[in-house]
Amino acid sequence: MLSCNGIVLNYAFVMYNKSISKINIVENIAKELPVPLVMSYFLCDCWYTFEKIINIFAARGFHTIGALKTNRMLYPFGFKKKLNEFASLLLITRSNFHLVTVKKQKYYVYRYEGKLNGIENAVVLLSYPEKAFGNPKALRAFLSTDVALSVDETLSYYACRWPIEIFFASVRIN
């Protein structure tokens, strides 16, 4: 999905062909995109937040905002640490988490800016729903290659994915 000037759209419908990987399909779509005239974002789930895809979209002028798996490697303070392990360490003090509201839902969020495997500098948001703060199963993480975005902006842009995800789910069922 692409976000440009406040509008979020599914850019292309491509029938899945098992002879071509989903990653290659996304690569081909990215290479066909026109260069955006304003700040634009590739919105994606955790399958597409890795170096190769991020770099292809960056070359076309798009930042990436997407989900991350909680076993993704970060480098806080220069030390390699799994995202979920880093979140557990942060819970000891709890002081670095801030309560934010996105579309009437409240979340405790920690903002990390730094290195990930294959990505020199990005923002990663570690997020817990307000009522599940500290529950390892409730931990969600989001990446933004646009480090200038606020926590609220990043989560608000990412939340724009859900209507289209619901559409895809209904298409798969039918």
Residue ranges and their predicted role:
Residues C4-N174:
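Single, function-defining residue in the core of a domain
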